Amino acid sequence: MKKMLIILFATGIYSCGNNPSATGQATTESVADKAADSITNKQDTLNALWINDFRDFRNAVYQDDVNKLKIYFKFPVLNPYNEIWSVVLADSTDIFGEVGSDTLHPFTENDFIKYHKKLFTKEFVSGILKIKSDELLKRKESSTDILDSDSTTNYSMSATVDTTDNTLRLIILFNTGYKDENGKFEKEGESSINYNFLIQSDGHLLFKEIRIAG
């Protein structure tokens, strides 16, 4: 009986030692699982960082904290087609005739200090305060209800995260029109202003550009 047990034990060792494919497969799967867990953990950490930075940015916008807002910019900003200038000078008596849209005009730190309220308008402030950050984190998108700007314009804001290029997009959609005799808004046209921010590797948001449509 004792001899039989020794033979069985030796057979078991031999069998395990001669099944390298099973051992190798288990090792490969273990490495793959660890790599996947590492990627997931890094993404979770990045998500926690950028969503907190978004909340800090939103608070700075609401509080009109210019010094805090400046950390989200790298000056000078060179915006395609000078569209940042189109926004800040839209309702201004300032004359912007130095260059055309084909030549980029730097938007400096001093320009930001002067025009930041034109950049972050009342519509931007009202909209971003209504973006649900928990929803944005979970679904990578969130949007507001339609809000009134004035008697001929309403608007809404949407926030989306594009994970392919790590970009946060804050988009204000404007609808122009009129209210009929029943108070129903009849849309005649629409336009949008896109505020694009890069989500950096440390989770900090950095302003990239403004794009205008419509």
Predicted feature descriptions by range:
Residues A35-D53, I71-G214:
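C-terminal-biased regions
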Residues D33-A35, V66:
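Elongated, non-catalytic scaffold/linker segments and compositionally distinctive motifs
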Residues D56-K68:
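Short helix-adjacent coil turns
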